[in-house]
Every structure is written in C-alpha cells, then in structure tokens.
C-alpha cells in the first residue's frame, strides 16, 4: 500500500473512485453526495488530494484541507473492490499524521446523517460528534478527532 500526492493526470481516476465509493448513497440521499459533484482539478493543484494505491492500482483517496486551527477531511473514498481491507482506516491515519506534522490540534469532517456505515467507522476510529448542520435536504454531523 502506498499513499501519494495526486497529479493532474489522476483526475479521471479520482472522479471514478469517488463516484464508485459514494454510489450506494445517491439513492439513499436522493441526490449525489457532495464529493461526487466536486471539481477536483483545483484541489489537485493545491495538493489536497492523495491517492492510495494497492499493488500499483488506485484503491482509494483522501482530500485534506489545511486550516489555521485544524485540518478538514473533505472526502474519504475507497473503491468497492477494496473496501473491508483497512484502506479507509489507513487514509484516516494518514490524515492524523499530516495534522500532527502541521502542528494542528485536530482533524474535522462533515458527514451526512444518513451515512450510518461511515459514522460507525469514524466513531470506531475515535471521532466524536460535535454538532449537526441544519439542512432540510442534507442534514449532517460535524465530528472531530483530537490528535
């Protein structure tokens, strides 16, 4: 397993992995999840996107934003064929490590309240709920993990 910075040439792979990973949630939410509709080219240019490769094949990705007092995970996506192998946890650990290297105290993320499988993963990893965003169409949880 290798986690590397995404390049402009990886854009189609990032879109494909994101669409595949979030596909089960489109029907549940009644619309594509926000990461599916994102334009990743600017994020790649800013160095926010990392690809996880398994045996040279793209298996997952994480999008991590650096803020003055925390890091924000915009998206964690693992391709369906690679789920259940610990790659999501590996990406969360990478985010923790990067947060420590930047000298920031915590990692934050938003997740849709209907994404129960993701919420269970985040809680098992040590995130805890800090609030909820009121949105009649996309209610969500705010969670964080202290480094």
Language model regions located:
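Extreme N-terminal starter segment of soluble prokaryotic enzymes
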Residues: 1-3
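C-terminal "cap" of GNAT-fold acetyltransferases
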Residues: 38-41, 48-50, 105-147
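Acetyl-CoA-dependent GNAT
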Residues: 5-83, 89-94, 98, 102, ...
């Amino acid at each position: 397993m290798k986690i590397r910075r995404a390049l402009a040439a990886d854009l189609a792979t990032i879109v494909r992995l994101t669409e595949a990973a979030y596909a089960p949630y489109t029907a549940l939410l009644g619309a594509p999840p926000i990461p599916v509709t994102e334009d990743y080219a600017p994020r790649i240019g800013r160095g926010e996107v990392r690809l996880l490769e398994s045996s040279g094949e793209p298996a997952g990705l994480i999008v991590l934003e650096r803020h003055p007092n925390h890091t924000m995970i915009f998206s964690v996506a693992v391709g369906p064929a690679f789920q259940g192998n610990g790659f999501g946890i590996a990406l969360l650990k990478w985010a923790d490590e990067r947060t420590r290297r930047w000298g920031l105290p915590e990692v934050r993320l938003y997740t849709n309240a209907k994404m129960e499988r993701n919420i269970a993963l985040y809680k098992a990893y040590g995130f805890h709920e800090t609030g909820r965003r009121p949105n009649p169409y996309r209610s969500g949880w705010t969670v964080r993990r202290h480094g």
